[in-house]
């Protein structure tokens, strides 16, 4: 057992500072066989007895590549070598896009953790992933939330939370770690298919930026994303606090006179909270802008949104079905 590398020390400092993986935790670790997940499993295994962690692995075979079965066999072989149990899932054939497969993967992760009494799902996302996601979202057009979308931890339910303990580590560091300990990294050839925008960003754009503009682009993106996260957390907490004070006790309605006094940033966040929590509707920016215009200019015209009617009545901004207000949950 080796626990003396700088990455071991960085890992322990991180989980203790952020209280990510307490003693006696039961961990379900997503394991692809790539360098990041191999480094994560190796480090967790090295500290397993010290922290009394119960560790199991979960592997997803998307069957998109001809060598996917060989990868799965290697993953299972490595799990047996470490005396760790592994859950293996094949992606249904009808899920043939990255987005649908990602949703299936996360739902399967959560369900497996819940059914088998794991209290923590562990993912191997790194600071490099965070930088790539930030740039990718920026190019597509996003809000502050999209620039800080990968977090240290997320509470998925009362029983299960998700953590990313390598989020301040870089891909160059996990690569070094795997070479140092001779870990059997499986190279995913699809990562070099530059017809995919994410791969082109990783293989061409970021190296170009490093060479000609900012050698520490990953570190700069990570720092910026972390600073944005602080602002996003504050705005979200403030929006939740105000929403709890202005919502109607019985009907789907809010005091729009109070909303009218707020900054547009808080107005939009409160509206998103209102529609997601009550109607499970994720409004787009145009719909949000229309509602804010309705509020700020006290327009009496109703707005139709997904079979609901949004209007104002006295001091209330309400959601109605036909002529009746809907009762709150």
Swiss-Prot record:
Pfam families, sorted: ATP_bind_3 (PF01171)
Q: Name one GO biological process term.
A: tRNA modification
Q: Which GO terms describe its cellular component?
A: chloroplast
Name the Gene Ontology molecular function terms of this record.
ATP binding; tRNA(Ile)-lysidine synthase activity
What keywords are annotated for this sequence in UniProt?
ATP-binding, Chloroplast, Ligase, Nucleotide-binding, Plastid, tRNA processing
Per the UniProt record, which EC number(s) apply here? Answer: 6.3.4.19
The reaction(s) catalysed by this protein are: cytidine(34) in tRNA(Ile2) + L-lysine + ATP = lysidine(34) in tRNA(Ile2) + AMP + diphosphate + H(+)
Q: Any transmembrane segments, and where?
A: none
Give the binding site residues for ATP. Answer: 32-37
Q: Which domain of life is it from?
A: Eukaryota
Q: Does the keyword Cell membrane apply?
A: no
Instruction: Give the SUPFAM superfamilies listed for this entry.
Output: Adenine nucleotide alpha hydrolases-like, MesJ substrate recognition domain-like
Where does this one sit in the cell?
Plastid, Chloroplast
What's the entry's take on its domains?
A: The N-terminal region contains the highly conserved SGGXDS motif, predicted to be a P-loop motif involved in ATP binding.
Role noted for this protein:
Ligates lysine onto the cytidine present at position 34 of the AUA codon-specific tRNA(Ile) that contains the anticodon CAU, in an ATP-dependent manner. Cytidine is converted to lysidine, thus changing the amino acid specificity of the tRNA from methionine to isoleucine.
Family assignment from sequence similarity: Belongs to the tRNA(Ile)-lysidine synthase family.
Tell me what this protein is called.
Answer: tRNA(Ile)-lysidine synthase, chloroplastic
What is the protein's species of origin? Pyropia yezoensis (Susabi-nori)
């Amino acid at each position: 057992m080796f626990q003396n590398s700088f990455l071991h020390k960085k890992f322990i400092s991180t989980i203790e500072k952020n209280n990510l993986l307490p003693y006696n935790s039961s961990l379900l670790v997503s394991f692809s066989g790539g360098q990041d997940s191999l480094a994560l499993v190796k480090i967790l295994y090295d500290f397993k007895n010290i922290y009394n962690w119960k560790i199991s692995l979960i592997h997803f075979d998307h069957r998109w590549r001809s060598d996917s079965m060989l990868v799965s066999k290697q993953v299972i072989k490595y799990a047996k070598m470490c005396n760790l149990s592994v859950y293996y899932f094949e992606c249904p054939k009808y899920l043939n896009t990255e987005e649908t497969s990602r949703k299936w993967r996360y739902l399967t992760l959560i369900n497996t953790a819940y059914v088998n009494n794991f209290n923590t799902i562990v993912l191997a996302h790194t600071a490099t992933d965070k930088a790539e996601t930030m740039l990718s979202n920026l190019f597509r057009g996003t809000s502050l939330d999209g620039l800080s979308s990968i977090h240290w931890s997320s509470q998925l339910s009362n029983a299960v939370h998700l953590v990313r303990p390598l989020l301040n580590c870089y891909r160059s560091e996990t690569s070094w770690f795997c070479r140092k300990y001779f870990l059997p990294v499986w190279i995913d050839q699809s990562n070099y298919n530059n017809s995919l925008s994410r791969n082109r960003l990783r293989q061409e754009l970021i190296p170009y930026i490093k060479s000609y503009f900012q050698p520490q682009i990953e570190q700069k993106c990570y720092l910026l994303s972390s600073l944005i996260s602080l602002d996003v957390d504050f705005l979200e907490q403030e929006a939740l606090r105000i929403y709890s004070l202005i919502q109607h006790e019985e009907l789907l309605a809010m005091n729009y006179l109070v909303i009218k006094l707020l900054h547009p940033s808080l107005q939009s966040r409160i509206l998103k909270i209102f529609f997601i929590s009550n109607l499970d509707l994720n409004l787009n920016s145009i719909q949000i802008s229309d509602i804010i215009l309705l509020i700020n200019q006290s327009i009496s015209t109703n707005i139709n949104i997904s079979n609901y009617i949004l209007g104002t009545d006295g001091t209330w901004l309400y959601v109605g079905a036909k002529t009746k207000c809907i009762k709150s949950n």
